[in-house]
Amino acid sequence: MSIFMTQPTLNYVSCASLADPSALLHAMAYWQWGNPAAGHVIVCVHGLSRQGRDFDVLARALVAAAQSQGHQVRVVCPDVVGRGQSEWLSDPAEYQIPTYAADVQTLLARLDSEAPLSTLDWVGTSMGGLIGMAVLGSPQFKPPLPVRRLILNDMGPTLEWTALQRIGTYLGRAGDFSS
């Protein structure tokens, strides 16, 4: 049976605090496109001030391309904690790449338990690329299977200090609105 989802489903996974595993869990939202039983999973992780729905056009195109070739795929786009539909953390100090990587590791384990993963691809934009490198390059994080393709967009292995300062100036500014 062929399944082609033209709209994503919103799902949640419970994640533990990296600093204090006995603390309350937080919910990370993720948007799922395509066949939820497909073993081929493409994870798309957004940038610092973005959300999983940023990948709607790409997810729709990936599902359609797979479908046209007779394949099934599941595209999963998390809202990193504190963004989109995900919960906020109680400790602001936990908003760091290791926390995000642990959350995505929990998500991958959940996806694998729902329908075993056979192929895993990763698309990471900016911070999403850093999270991908943390998940895939750290011995403490073990995805259910090796990533076949890692696509890094708008980032590299190093960050220039001036670029971080520039990001800090616009993220730290409150917006002015007429209403």
Language-model features, listed with the residues they occupy:
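An N-terminal hydrophobic leader/cap segment in hydrolases
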Residues: M1-S17, W31
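A short loop-to-beta-strand scaffold at the N-terminal edge of the catalytic core in hydrolase folds
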Residues: Y12, S22-W33
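N-terminal Rossmann-like NAD(P)+-binding domain of SDR-like oxidoreductases, especially those catalyzing
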Residues: V13, H46, S126
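Active-site loop/oxyanion-hole signature of alpha/beta-hydrolase fold enzymes
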Residues: A23-L24, V63, R74-V123, G137-P143
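Conserved HGGG/HGGXW glycine-rich cap/lid loop of the alpha/beta-hydrolase fold
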Residues: A29-W88
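Short amphipathic alpha-helical segments
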Residues: F55-V57, W88-S90, V135-L136, A163-Q165
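Conserved hydrolase catalytic core segment
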Residues: L117-W161
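Helix-rich cap/lid subdomain of alpha/beta-hydrolase
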Residues: M155-S179
